Amino acid sequence: MFAIFEVGSKQYKVQKGDVIYVEKQDKKVGESISFDKVLMVDATIGKPYIKNATVSCKVEKQGKQKKIFIIKHKRYTRSLKRQGHRQPYTKLVVTGINVK
């Protein structure tokens, strides 16, 4: 059984036991979280979401991605601006797909 659900502005296709990385969620490690914006379960398609369907997940890790560097350079003036950014994420393990 698979499901497609929405977190923030992104959609994820998952099965039970899958590990996904989503935008930062305000939950502690070990807590469970459930998402109700389920777009599709197997052959059932929602309009836009399926009522009474949830995807349950367990928070495995809160972390930050690898640092990316932004460099802005202006020619002729020897000016250079460097900036770094690390995007926070939440690592989730799918524990169940529930349809009532």
Curated annotation (Swiss-Prot):
Pfam name, any one: Ribosomal_L21p
Gene Ontology molecular function, alphabetical: rRNA binding; structural constituent of ribosome
One Gene Ontology CC term in the entry: cytoplasm
Top-rank taxon, per record: Bacteria
Protein keywords: Ribonucleoprotein, Ribosomal protein, RNA-binding, rRNA-binding
GO biological process: translation
Xref: HAMAP family: Ribosomal_bL21
Family assignment from sequence similarity: Belongs to the bacterial ribosomal protein bL21 family.
Assembly and binders: Part of the 50S ribosomal subunit. Contacts protein L20.
NCBIfam families attached to this UniProt entry: L21
Functional summary from the UniProt entry: This protein binds to 23S rRNA in the presence of protein L20.
Name of the protein this chain belongs to: Large ribosomal subunit protein bL21
Organism name: Malacoplasma penetrans (strain HF-2) (Mycoplasma penetrans)
Gene label: rplU
